[in-house]
């Protein structure tokens, strides 16, 4: 709307003709930064901290790895953007373009060890988030999510951006910690086991019991889940 509004004025000033009346999703003047420090003892020790930093270095050095590294970060960011009625596609486009436009590496995050051996993580990406107008102001679910976050309207867009970036940083920490220890497949398999438990009709405490027995069996399948559920209920 703003681009279309100023187009005639620009034509008058320049004597030219305006063709594209649209803004860019590369919002470099609306970058948001979040950082945190985790003591090594809360992550599993110094070896895990070193493993996370090595995984980060791999992402910095290899385009195939950084694609998955950054995608994992967006696994955390996108749901919050969607839940609050914002445009996740615009945020995705801006973040990925910015990662290649900026100087240095293409990772959205940076990880380093502090002097006392703790792990410090930082994320900085464009975050064109809004709270006035659009679905955020009209969609009942989006309004409820914003209320849960206790973000003020108007004036809370910067705070919401910080929340979203913090989620992305924590998501990346979780993924890198898993990769630096037992591997990410173990966590995925645990989630798959729980989903199967619910799918075959497990209720309440049965879900955790069934999921654990499924993992122990090494056969995380629907038919095995049904068999174990029947045994639990005997």
PLM segments and residue spans:
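N-terminal charge/polar-biased segments
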Residues: 185, 192-234
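Metallocofactor- and cofactor-centric catalytic cores in central/energy metabolism, strongly enriched
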Residues: 1, 12-15, 19, 26-28, ...
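General structural signal for secondary-structure boundaries
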Residues: 1, 11, 39, 151-152, ...
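Alpha-helix boundary/capping residues
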Residues: 59, 98, 152, 183, ...
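Alpha-helix initiation and N-capping motif
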Residues: 45, 49-52, 74, 88, ...
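Glycine-rich anion/phosphate-binding loop at the beta-strand->alpha-helix junction
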Residues: 2-138
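C-terminal catalytic subdomain
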Residues: 84-198
